[in-house]
Amino acid sequence: MLAPYACQPGESRGRQQPESMSTFRSPFQRDRDRIIHSSAFRRLKHKTQVFVEHEGDYYRTRLTHSIEVAQVARTISGVLGLNTDLAECIALAHDLGHTPFGHTGEDALAKLMEPYGGFDHNAQAMRIVTRLERHYAEFDGLNLTWESLEGIAKHNGPVEGPLPYALAEANAQWDLELHTYASAEAQVAAIADDVAYSHHDLHDGLRSGLFTEDDLMELPVTAPAFAEVDALYPGLEPMRRRHEALRRVFGRMVEDVIAVAQGRLEAAQPKSVEEIRQMGATVIRFSKPLYQELKVIRSFLFHRMYRAPSVMKERAKVTAVVNDLFPLFMRQPELLPQEWRRDVEAAEDETTLARIVADYVAGMTDRFALQEHARLCG
């Protein structure tokens, strides 16, 4: 049974293009399924976060990360009496707008797009689900419910200041109330992202040799976890020791979020999702002590992993790929695939063309971007 402050499927604000109700699935289940079956979601399999795709098969991709985020979101939302289908839907959609080569690719594309309104992966996710997916006979995009669109747009909180063009375009059509906080389900999806990447970046960094278990014995959160495992399982083989310690870190993060949320919900006693939106602060968050400890972990990961010499070397290589491909397609848009030509021919100015090229480049997988760069740029 859903809590009164959860998003109730029967009270959805609906879709831009009206559709008949499904016999077997709720509106949010249909949204989730449409995301899973989208081309953009499938492409996440070959988009990486930190490590370049061809570096190894073990490391997380955007797809595996999104699945992990969805799992965490379902767990937390279920305990809190929230709509698990909506939380899962937003979690699965949150990375759809990412470029090839992780944040490195986004930084390069954003710089190239500065004269044309900029580029932001969160806004690009909105552009994908409202415009770029073209599989349905009656509409462009996925025709998601208002609640799913709100969650994608605002899962990190109210959106203030100048809007990225993709988000401004969507908001003009749907009025996503960007000045308010999002539903609790969207807030859960956001913090599930924090939990998942903090956990798996520790895993991947250890696996890659960028740091060791001894390094983690010096840090908050991880040090107590390793100490507990060593006390319970003396002499445990290294891989099992690592896994047991990091699953405790993972568990502590999830349990902390649930405990804090339960306390805040009990204190506020919200009677509807609208009261959640108007609370003036997030209801789903880490406790202050754990948040401070996780800041230490993130600082460690930033210096030892995200800015490691081997990673920085790859950053330079893949930045060059984006920096070469974007201006090439701007000069010669006829190089774009046939299905993109209609949009190119309809482009009325350079800004519109740049946004089409950015859509195409952002949609590339790591592997395809490297292949196209080798083919077109030698």
Curated annotation (Swiss-Prot):
Species:
Cereibacter sphaeroides (strain ATCC 17025 / ATH 2.4.3)
Q: Which UniProt keywords apply?
A: Hydrolase
Q: Name the family the entry cites.
A: Belongs to the dGTPase family. Type 2 subfamily.
Q: What Pfam families is this protein classified in?
A: HD (PF01966), HD_assoc (PF13286)
Under which name does UniProt file this protein? Deoxyguanosinetriphosphate triphosphohydrolase-like protein
Tell me the SMART domains matching this sequence. Answer: HDc (SM00471)
Start-end of Polar residues biased regions: 15-26
BP-aspect Gene Ontology terms: dGTP catabolic process
Which Gene Ontology molecular function entries are recorded, alphabetically?
dGTPase activity
Q: Does the keyword Protein biosynthesis apply?
A: no
The answer to whether UniProt assigns keyword Hydrolase to this entry is yes
Name the lineage.
Answer: Bacteria, Pseudomonadati, Pseudomonadota, Alphaproteobacteria, Rhodobacterales
Alphabetized InterPro entries for the sequence: dGTPase (IPR006261), dGTPase-like (IPR050135), dNTPase_2 (IPR023023), HD/PDEase_dom (IPR003607), HD_domain (IPR006674), PHydrolase_assoc_dom (IPR026875)
Q: Which CDD domains match?
A: HDc
